């Protein structure tokens, strides 16, 4: 249970730091940090816990919630629309669509499926490690 709480607090701190940084970071760097850092924290602590399915469920639930709050926070900033326009001009050679509209269900679904897939893979890896030892 302590690893579950540690994971939730660590991921909350990550999204808190990203919220504090706000729009002072490149959009691609922010996207990569959002995708890599929370799953790395969750993955490392997943191998230490005994609550496999509970751990996976609560991590996905809370990381999705943190992601939602982070996006709502960014979109509420006064410079958000000009920031998106400037970032899209900078990324014109890369095929990325970023809009200033509210993010929707598809982003949360992608993030949930991404987290679920990674944690299921880690679950099976953990089972294989246990059976070999």
Curated annotation (Swiss-Prot):
Residues that span the membrane, as ranges: 3-23, 27-47, 55-75, 103-123
Membrane topology designation: Multi-pass membrane protein
Cellular compartments per GO CC: plasma membrane
Keywords, alphabetical: Cell membrane, Membrane, Transmembrane, Transmembrane helix
Subcellular location: Cell membrane
Function comment: Accessory element involved in the expression of sarA and several virulence factors. Modulates SarA production and/or function in a strain-dependent manner. Affects the transcription of the accessory gene regulator (agr) and genes encoding virulence factors including alpha toxin (hla) and protein A (spa).
Protein name from the UniProt record: Protein msa
Organism: Staphylococcus aureus (strain bovine RF122 / ET3-1)
């Amino acid at each position: 249970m302590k690893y579950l709480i540690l994971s939730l607090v660590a991921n909350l701190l990550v999204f808190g730091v990203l919220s504090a940084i706000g729009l002072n970071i490149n959009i691609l760097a922010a996207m990569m940090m959002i995708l890599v850092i929370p799953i790395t924290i969750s993955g490392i602590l997943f191998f230490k816990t005994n609550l496999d399915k509970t751990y996976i469920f609560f991590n996905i639930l809370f990381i999705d919630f943190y992601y939602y709050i982070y996006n709502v926070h960014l979109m509420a900033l006064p410079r958000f629309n000009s920031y998106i326009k400037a970032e899209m001009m900078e990324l014109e050679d890369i095929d990325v669509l970023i809009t200033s509209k509210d993010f929707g269900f598809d982003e949360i679904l992608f993030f949930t499926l991404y987290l679920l897939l990674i944690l299921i893979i880690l679950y099976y890896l953990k089972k294989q490690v246990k059976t070999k030892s």
